[in-house]
């Protein structure tokens, strides 16, 4: 992503709590359970990039670029609390949905709005986050995709001259 947007990004560049090395959205799957330190965490959904990242890094379409690449990051829920320290390994202990990588889920949600069947399959994964489950189930039922403009651009919408508002 750094090469694509022409910026050097450091740790926590996107306000993340965990930064992983060697585990990308192509390998990580919805429902994956990890032990890290004394805690146990589970991937619940891809991150939905928003306008705040674009504003922070001054790249108006940054959220769209993340969606296009599939490198959105993901959300973890705490299954078991415990102490965690920087530098500790995340050990995969369970992968209940090996066919549902984070990047595949992102592609289905944002780049395949016409595929109601896959939206329904993804929505039926019990460990998927509630907001994603609701939106995908609605899409599977109605065939409509909500407008992502407010999330993606927010107050950063360009005006009619192509300048940032």
Model-derived regions: residue spans:
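Metal-cofactor-dependent catalytic cores
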Residues: 1-165
């Amino acid at each position: 992503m750094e090469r694509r947007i022409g910026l050097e990004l450091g740790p926590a560049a996107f306000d993340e709590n965990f930064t992983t090395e060697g585990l990308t959205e192509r390998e990580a799957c919805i429902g994956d359970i990890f032990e890290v330190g004394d805690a146990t965490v589970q991937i619940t959904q891809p991150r939905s990039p928003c306008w705040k990242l674009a504003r922070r890094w001054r790249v108006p379409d940054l959220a769209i670029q993340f969606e296009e690449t599939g490198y959105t990051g993901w959300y973890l829920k705490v299954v078991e609390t415990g102490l965690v320290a920087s530098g500790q390994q995340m050990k995969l202990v369970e992968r209940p949905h090996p066919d549902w990588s984070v990047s595949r889920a992102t592609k289905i949600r944002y780049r395949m709005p016409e595929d109601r069947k896959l939206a329904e399959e993804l929505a039926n994964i019990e460990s998927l986050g509630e907001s994603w489950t609701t939106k995908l189930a609605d899409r599977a039922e109605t065939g409509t995709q909500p407008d992502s403009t407010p999330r993606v651009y927010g107050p950063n919408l360009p005006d009619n001259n192509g300048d940032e508002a």
